[in-house]
């Protein structure tokens, strides 16, 4: 039958990268198929054609009848079955080896980068002894079925299942599941219907049933492995959202921070201080009593409540009303003083004699102040020249 050691060595490596059920399947393949096929089955079918005897002397009739009874030998059919069933495993093994090599190269690159980083860290800060022994020095490979490797594994199981079913169905249509001791043949060049006899029919039937049971067990293991992987994938997909929900930490609402409670460092200012101030008169902070708001400023406040603050620069003057009104009384006072000075200059030459008399009377009244109580009731003093210019009571009406 030849040497099966090459295929056995490859399948042993596939065994390292399979699931538990896949390893059981490989055990069934090795022990109950390859081993039995290489030892016992060859001896049973060794004399198959030589012991096939027909009751005719017609040349070639016996060979034609054997070809009709056994279009392909059982042993060769089972060898083809083993090869076809093992081919998906070989394809998966090639992909797994490629995946493992790529992972090894990636780990080597990461290890090189880690060593370079460790050397840089040692130059900056030397490590304590036994600190960098956390990594696994053995480099043991932890095999995991995930991603493309898992998909390849499932596909190779599906193809194995299809090949198993195909060979079982093919064997049934070729031979059936029993070997009859008598086979009737009427194929040309046989002169008539010829009786042919098969050697060891019972023993061959037992081997056929045994190999059929092994194929059924292999098919069952394939179906169980596919179901196991699919259920495992579904459970992982259902478990992932629950883990994500458990891993999510509920966010606590951030409380508002009062700006006044934050200590401000010297030379820095808080961004919250740039918000618009709630009052408009900075003089109140110094202790000056604020004056009542003018009508224009009331309109300003009403317009603030009506619209957004962005349009204030367009609707109103940029100057605050308080500062604008603080300058207007000063200008009015200066103008009033200038008008009074002009009136005084015009009336000065006309009122000089009267003013002198009034001043003399005032001086005499002051000298006689305690002795003239009757004159205090009625003030007959003439108005000063400044009092004539304005009707308001002024502090400089009396000259001391």
UniProtKB/Swiss-Prot annotation:
Membrane topology according to the record: Multi-pass membrane protein
Intramembrane residue stretches from the record: 2-12
PROSITE patterns: CONNEXINS_1, CONNEXINS_2
Residues with site note (Cleavage): 368-369
Outcome of substituting residue 368 to D: Increases cleavage by caspase-3
Membrane topology, Cytoplasmic segments: 13-21, 93-156, 227-400
GO cellular component terms given for this protein: connexin complex; plasma membrane
Record-listed Phosphoserine modification sites: 364
Polar residues bias locations: 129-138
Biased amino acid composition, Basic and acidic residues: 104-118, 327-336
Pfam families referenced in this protein's UniProt entry, alphabetically: Connexin, Connexin50
Bilayer-crossing regions: 22-42, 72-92, 157-177, 206-226
Main location, first listed in the record: membrane
Keyword annotations of the record: Cell junction, Cell membrane, Disulfide bond, Gap junction, Membrane, Phosphoprotein, Transmembrane, Transmembrane helix
Gene Ontology molecular functions: gap junction channel activity
Extracellular side stretches: 43-71, 178-205
Disulfide bond annotation, renumbered to this chain: 54-196, 61-190, 65-185
Domain of life, source organism: Eukaryota
Chain intervals with Low complexity compositional bias: 381-392
Annotated region described as Disordered, given as residue ranges: 104-139, 323-400
Coiled-coil portions: none
Biological function: Structural component of eye lens gap junctions. Gap junctions are dodecameric channels that connect the cytoplasm of adjoining cells. They are formed by the docking of two hexameric hemichannels, one from each cell membrane. Small molecules and ions diffuse from one cell to a neighboring cell via the central pore.
Subunit annotation: A hemichannel or connexon is composed of a hexamer of connexins. A functional gap junction is formed by the apposition of two hemichannels. Forms heteromeric channels with GJA3. During early stages of lens development, interacts with the C-terminus of MIP.
Family in the record: Belongs to the connexin family. Alpha-type (group II) subfamily.
Protein name: Gap junction alpha-8 protein
Lineage per the UniProt record: Eukaryota, Metazoa, Chordata, Craniata, Vertebrata
Gene encoding the protein: GJA8
